[in-house]
Amino acid sequence: MKNITDYIQQWANTYKDDMQNNIMPFWIKYGLDRVNGGIYTCVDRDGALMDSTKSVWFQGRFAFTCSYAYNHIEKNPAWLQAAKSTLDFIEKYCFDSDGRMYFEVTADGRPLRKRRYIFSESFAAIAMSEYSIASGDKTYAVKALELFKRMQYFLQTPGLLAPKYRDTLPMKGHSITMI
C-alpha cells in the first residue's frame, strides 16, 4: 500500500462494488413488497421471507439508502423506483392521526406498535430529503422539512414523548442526539 489515500480508495471501491453487486440487488429482488409497497424487513440470507411485519424506521432507512445510492453511486432507475415505492408506503400507512409515526406495521400497512421516540420520523425525513434530490421532486424537500419541524415540536414539548425513566433516577439518553 503506497499511502493512506490509496488505502482509503481501495476500501471505497470495495464498498461501492458491494452496494452495486450485492446489497442493492439483494434487497430489490427479495425485500421489495410488490403487492403493498414498501420493503420487507425480515428476510433470510437466501431471500426467504421470515416475517411480513414491517419496521417503519427501516422503511425510511431503505428509501434513504436507495435515494443516496442513486445520487452517489449509480443512476439506477430500479433504485429510484424502490425509494418511491417505499416513500409511498410510508405516507399512506405509517403516520398516525396525531402526526407521529408508527414503529411497526403489518405488510398491508395496519399499525402494530408505536414507540415513544422519533426514530421512524428521523429516517423518513432524511429519506424524503434525499429522494427530493434524486428525483428532482421538491415537494419531498418540503415534506422532509415539515417532518423535521414536527420532530422538533415533539422533542421540545414536555409530555409529548413519554419518559423512559422515572424521576427516582434521572437520566438522559443519547439516542436522539445520535440520530
Identify the residue ranges that each predicted region occupies.
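Glycan-recognition and catalytic cores of secretory/periplasmic carbohydrate-active enzymes
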Residues: 1-179
